[in-house]
Amino acid sequence: LHHIKNAAKKLLKNDFIIVTMNHRSSYDHTFPAQIHDVKAAIRFLKGNSEALNIDPNFIVVQGYSSGGHLAAFMGASSGKTKFNLNGKEIDLEGSLGNHLDQNGDVHAVVDWYGPVDLQQMDDCRDVVRPKRNEDARSLLIGGPIAENKTLTQLVSPVTYLDSKTPPFLIFHGAKDTAVPVCQSEILH
C-alpha cells in the first residue's frame, strides 16, 4: 500500500481529487448491483461538482483486480444506459441516488489487472487455478458461467467496447496467477 500512498500524494499535490467508493459485494448481490453503485457514486460527484470543486467533465476511475473489472466496465459502458444481447436487456445506469439528472459516464480508466472477458478467463491461463475463481465469477452472475453465456458476456467489459470508449491505462503483472495477463492483452 505504500506505493498507493505515494501516488495519491503526487496526485493531490497536482490538484487532483481522490474519492474512494464502496459497492455491494457479489457475495450479497449479483450483477449489475455493483455497477449501479459505482454509477450512482459518479452521478453524486457530478451532481455536487461545484461544492466539491470537481470537474464533472474529467472523471477517471481506477481499480485493482475485481475493482479493475468495475473500472473497466465503467469505461466500456460509458455513453450507454441500456444494452441488449441475445434478447436479454440490461440497465447499465441504474436508478440509485438523488442525482438521476446526471450520468455515470467516466472519461478515462486506470485498470490494474482487472478481468475483462469472464468467458475467456480459463482459456488463456498458464496456471491451473482452484475452483474458487470460477466460484467468484459465478457469484457475480448468480449461476455457473458455462450455463449463463449471455449473462457472462453482459458482465464482461469487452462486450461494450466501441470507438467511443474512453482511454485506458492498463497495468498487469506477467506472473499474475489470479487474473491471467491475457485479460489485459484483450484490452490492448
Report the location of each language-model feature.
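Alpha/beta-hydrolase superfamily serine-hydrolase fold, recognizing
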Residues: 1-188
